[in-house]
């Protein structure tokens, strides 16, 4: 089974990448705590799924204390997305959404 962890900067394209991965046949889950990844993979294997991915978002970091331990045990492919600050700023200005890491100076938060 292929197991992928998709993460990166807020506004860097995780939602778009998730859609592409789903189009490639990945079963994707958002912000599932790492301690639940092994049961997810067991269930996926039992159902014959060949590709599973999880999206890790900065807003869910409180649930990710055991991330390093689980990454070592499962050895997933990790995809980290980033973009230039001016691109992130433009995307947030287009969507008019509040940056998930703070409502202060947007450029500083990026």
Curated annotation (Swiss-Prot):
ATP binds at residues 8-15. Keywords: ATP-binding, GTP-binding, Nucleotide-binding. It comes from the Bacteria. One of its GO terms (molecular function) is ATP binding. GTP binds at residues 57-60. InterPro entries: P-loop_NTPase, RapZ-like, RapZ-like_N. The keyword ATP-binding applies. The keyword Nucleotide-binding applies. PANTHER family: RNASE ADAPTER PROTEIN RAPZ. Belongs to the RapZ-like family. Displays ATPase and GTPase activities. This is Nucleotide-binding protein in fmt 3'region.
């Amino acid at each position: 089974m292929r197991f992928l962890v998709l993460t990166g900067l807020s506004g860097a394209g995780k939602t778009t990448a998730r859609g592409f991965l789903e189009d490639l046949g990945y079963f994707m889950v958002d912000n599932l705590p790492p301690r639940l990844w092994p049961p997810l993979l067991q269930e996926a294997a039992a159902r014959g799924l060949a590709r599973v991915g999880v999206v890790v978002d900065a807003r869910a970091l409180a649930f990710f204390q055991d991330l390093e331990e689980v990454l070592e045990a499962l050895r997933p492919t990790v995809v980290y997305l980033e973009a230039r600050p001016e691109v992130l700023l433009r995307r947030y200005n287009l969507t008019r959404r509040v940056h998930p890491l703070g409502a202060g100076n947007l450029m500083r938060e990026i």
